[in-house]
Amino acid sequence: MGQCCTGGGKAVAGDEAEPGTSKAAPPSRGTSSKNGSAKQQPCSPAAKAAATEAAAAASSSKKPAGPIGEVLERPMEEVRTTYSIGKELGRGQFGVTHLCTHKATGEKLACKTIAKRKLANKEDVDDVRREVQIMHHLSGQPNIVDLRGAYEDKHNVHLVMELCAGGELFDRIIARGHYTERAAAALLRAIVGIVHTCHSMGVIHRDLKPENFLLLSKGDDAPLKATDFGLSVFFKEGEVFRDIVGSAYYIAPEVLKRKYGPEADIWSIGVMLYIFLAGVPPFWAESENAIFTAILRGQIDLASEPWPKISSGAKDLVRKMLNINPKERLTAFQVLNHPWIKEDGDAPDVPLDNVVLNRLKQFRAMNQFKKAALRIIAGCLSEEEIKGLKEMFKNIDKDNSGTITLEELKNGLAKQGTKFSDNEIEQLMEAADADGNGIIDYEEFVTATVHMNKMDREEHLYTAFQYFDKDNSGYITKEELEQALKEQGLYDANEIKDVITDADSNNDGRIDYSEFVAMMRKGSGCAEATNPKKKRRDLVL
């Protein structure tokens, strides 16, 4: 939504760690004293975050403690006791974000509300709990969104955090109208500094992209804030993660191979640097699978326009950040010490070709269109549909083992009358079977089939198309797109022409249904085609 320091709904990221390692226990980087003793004991970031939460809960109210909440595992408390809730800022299937005001101070903040009924299993609950722990752990860092409080009542979990009124990172680039390598270096320096902080505190973000960096205000000197820690995890040095999470253009090759660590964040920032300098992603294709294939090849184009005009220092840094071998890739600290990125470094203060700025405008505009469409699709997924998938699993799992094989899945889906092709079922099994043992369990099945059977189905794409096609003419016109984006709070008059131009393959000045579907499926913004544990907070924009 680009207006508050929050990514919206809750993300799912389960079974990330290599067997035998701690899923949410980072390296012991801090100390704590026991009963005032001078003796220091190791304290992990997760433990410190939990302690911070407990302290916040203990000091937030003088009233008698309420019943313990099953999500945050501390006394439940009404968020409206402290904050007044204002206008809606964004909505999706799994939650809604409102403007809120602190009653005592008048401070304007953002309140993200997650409906507890949407937390379908223990993994979902653990993910919300971990997101809160990580945000508490990172609290106080100047360029990371500040979580002011986490509240739980009978029906919801509420996360109150800073309001970022300055828009997205792309907004700053585009608004200035001119752009230099030195400006790109300054942006990258801020971003890498944030990631260096996260890594030094034992946190991998796992979803770094321009949309997750917001400006605190509209001022020229407004600080950049990293947001959306819904996919983030605590890590220990040497720990290996296996979940495929992130956004398609920015996913590192080792993530696709299900064996990665903090180096994956550096790859994502390298992709961002490429986009800052060229205006397009380095790995571009007509479908997610083709994008992933290109990523795995790791061949980057530094010869086409505008690269001949880009400095050798910038190209050197791009190569070193997009090294396909994570062991040879630069660390955040090494990036910050590269000659091109330093404050008085080698990045020239010469305007980049206008084509770069125009490409950035078009790239951002299409993201906004897709955001609006995904929001409509999210509304198509009812709680009843999800419950139906749970019942489907029970019927397929005849021996009540809690797992099903590929053949059981094929037979069970056929008996259920669900129209999956063999290829879809095989993709489903491959994506969901994280440990490669040939079976999927209940939670994997539900999260995977929600995507395969709901998110990308024709009827939901058509529903989204109809939302934009206000007069039911079979076409989305410039005026209809303007109206729809205004309704979604994503409107920018300067971007509408770029959106139409990019999607309108037959150049008739409007978007028909086939062009709309092609646009939605071309280089989709999230890794759902391969990731059964879909990024739920992408649907709350």
Swiss-Prot record:
Residues 1-74 are annotated as: Disordered. GO terms for biological process: intracellular signal transduction. ATP binds at residues 89-97, 112. Residues 38-67 have a biased composition (Low complexity). Keywords: ATP-binding, Calcium, Kinase, Lipoprotein, Membrane, Metal-binding, Myristate, Nucleotide-binding, Repeat, Serine/threonine-protein kinase, Transferase. SUPFAM superfamilies: EF-hand, Protein kinase-like (PK-like). It comes from the Eukaryota. InterPro entries: CDPK_Ser/Thr_kinases, EF-hand-dom_pair, EF_Hand_1_Ca_BS, EF_hand_dom, Kinase-like_dom_sf, Prot_kinase_dom, Protein_kinase_ATP_BS, Ser/Thr_kinase_AS. Ca(2+) 3 binds at residues 469, 471, 473, 475, 480. Specifically expressed in heading panicles, spikelets and mature pollen grains. Not expressed in vegetative tissues. Its EC number is 2.7.11.1. It is an enzyme of class 2 (transferase). Ca(2+) 4 binds at residues 504, 506, 508, 510, 515. GO terms for molecular function: ATP binding; calcium ion binding; calcium-dependent protein serine/threonine kinase activity; calcium/calmodulin-dependent protein kinase activity; calmodulin binding; protein serine kinase activity. One of its GO terms (cellular component) is membrane. Ca(2+) 1 binds at residues 397, 399, 401, 403, 408. Residues 347-377 are annotated as: Autoinhibitory domain. A lipid is attached at residue 2 (N-myristoyl glycine). The active site is at 207 (proton acceptor). Residues 1-11 have a biased composition (Gly residues). Activated by calcium. Autophosphorylation may play an important role in the regulation of the kinase activity. Residues 384-419, 420-455, 456-491, 493-526 form the EF-hand domain. It catalyses: L-seryl-[protein] + ATP = O-phospho-L-seryl-[protein] + ADP + H(+); L-threonyl-[protein] + ATP = O-phospho-L-threonyl-[protein] + ADP + H(+). There are 3 contiguous domains conserved in the CDPK subfamily: a kinase domain, an autoinhibitory (junction) domain and a calmodulin-like domain. The autoinhibitory domain (347-377) inactivates kinase activity under calcium-free conditions. Belongs to the protein kinase superfamily. Ser/Thr protein kinase family. CDPK subfamily. This is Calcium-dependent protein kinase 25.
